[in-house]
Structures are given as C-alpha cells and as structure tokens.
Amino acid sequence: GLGDVYKRQPEEAVKKYTEKYVGDYRNDLEPMYKKDEQDKEDEESIGAWYSYYKGIESHVQLCNTLVLTYRIDYNEYTGGAHGIYMSTFLNLDLKTLSPIRLDDLFEGDYKEALTDLLWKQLMADNNVSTRQELEDMGYATTGDLEPIENFYLDPTGITFYYNVYEIAPYVMGATKITLSYEDIAPLMNGKFIVLSSAIKTDGE
C-alpha cells in the first residue's frame, strides 16, 4: 500500500539525518562523557577497554495520511565507563516528504511560552513546584531546558525527548516531557491544528 512506499522512500534520509544528529551530539557532549570516564577511571581500572559495538535500529512509530514518525535508537560502546545511547525522532510531512520542524507547527515567537510549559510539565511529572527543586534533582544542570527539534507527535500531544546529558546527568537517563494538545493550543498554527486532529482521530 501507500504506507509501504513511504516507509521505503525515507530510509536514506533517516540514515543521513541520524548520522548528522549523532555527529552533532557527539561534538557537543563528548567532553562530558570523557570527563565521566576520567572520573570513573580514577576510581577503578576498567577492564572493558577493548570491547566496541555500535548499533542503529529504526522503526515507524506513527503513520497516517499526513505524517510519518520514525524512531531511531542509536547506541555505541567504545570501552570505558559509559556507552553512548540516544533516541532520535524524525517526523516527516507526507505531502512534501520533508522533516517537520517546530517552526512548522507553532505560531510566531513561541519559544519562551513553550519553555515555560516544559518547565511546568516537568515540575508536575516530578511532583515539585519550583525550578530550583528540579535543578536540585539534576535537571537543567548539563544543558538548558528549552524546546528542541527532537520530538514526536502522538494522540496525547507533543513529546520532547532529551537524550542523556542534554539536560541532565548520565545517571538520570533520557528525559521525556509530553505537552498535551490542550496545553499548547494557544501556540499552535493552522497546520498543526489539522495535524493534531488527524493524529487524535487515529488514536481513537
């Protein structure tokens, strides 16, 4: 069927996208991994230096007539204390076959309002009432909490996915923050309203 054609077509794009994302991620965050490795190494001598692996898996997380969401899980281990692992999401507009970016979904100058919503939701998820409490837990200590292009859409809303080190230390793992369509409604543009209602209908 039509879905199959779409699934085959973007494979190459997905591969390129992943390689670029992983490259950027490594450039930005490699120093943190290195420092962690150093700290670990000081405590103990690591016997696993010689093992090395790398894996990329991708699968279709959502597909309807308007949007296709790929989830790409990447991991690599080069010895040392930590493997690098991350998940990236690629949302394709099936009319144009181009990636959907935040600017395609939100009106005007949305970043500040969206950032506030992310903080509020993360507080709710952790049962705290201040940003300081979140920071004490480790959030926003390795990077700023702000809207990023690594997100996916599903019937519940938009989920921003922060890989290890992007906003929190390695030990805390990845952080997912889901904002409901109701919460972001005032910021959504016409295209996003159409998209979200199609996705919600799929979920019923």
Q: Positions of the model-derived regions?
A:
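Compositionally biased intrinsically disordered regions enriched in Thr/Gly
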Residues: G1-E204
